[in-house]
């Protein structure tokens, strides 16, 4: 009986630790993992930055403004204190530019194998940039990248225009079998 109780306690501990570990990153707002080295999300908390570090992330790229509602002003300091690289590319929500995207892509291309989290406030900007980056630089199909982006949101007209323009500049079509770019109003 004592052995059975000990085994149950060990099993319970293992299950607790497994479930806690499995859900930690998924607790970050709209967290999406695209590959072993690239993820996107909404704004992580200060505590979640430590989780990212513990999971092997080496670079945090932030593409919103530090004065946004749920941002914290010293994220750059917190990230650097954890030993990760920090890149800040402020993207105006209703005026994103191709230059904004290419600044992000350039930072990724300098060290493409560094484990990176791209984030904004709710993962709208970040999932759109992730879509473009994956299609243009990682040879992910439009259908797969779009399905991932649409698990977060369906881009509005402003963002759709940016996406279509950048794809066109790079000789890619936004269209794919089963893809709909209809904007939900």
Provide a role label for each language-model segment.
Residues 5-16:
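Bacterial N-terminal signal peptides
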Residues 18-117, 131-185:
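Cys-dependent protein tyrosine phosphatase-like superfamily
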Residues 124-128:
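Glycine-rich nucleophile elbow surrounding the catalytic serine of serine-hydrolase chemistry
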Residues 120:
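Short cysteine clusters
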């Amino acid at each position: 009986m004592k052995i059975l109780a000990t085994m149950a306690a060990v099993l319970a501990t293992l299950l607790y630790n497994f479930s806690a570990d499995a859900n930690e990153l998924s607790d970050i707002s709209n967290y999406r993992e695209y590959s072993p080295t690239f993820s996107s999300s909404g704004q992580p908390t200060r505590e979640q930055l430590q989780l990212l570090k513990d999971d092997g992330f080496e670079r945090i790229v932030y593409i919103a403004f530090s004065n946004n509602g749920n941002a914290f002003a010293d994220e750059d300091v917190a990230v650097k204190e954890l030993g990760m690289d920090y890149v800040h590319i402020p993207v105006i929500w209703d005026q994103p530019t191709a230059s904004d995207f290419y600044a992000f892509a350039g930072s990724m291309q300098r060290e493409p194998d560094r484990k990176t989290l791209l984030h904004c406030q709710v993962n709208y900007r970040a999932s759109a940039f992730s879509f473009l980056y994956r299609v243009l630089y990682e040879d992910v199909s439009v259908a797969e990248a779009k399905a991932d982006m649409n698990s977060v949101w369906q881009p509005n007209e402003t963002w759709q225009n940016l996406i279509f323009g950048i794809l066109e500049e790079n000789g890619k079509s936004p269209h794919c079998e089963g893809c709909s770019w209809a904007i939900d109003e």
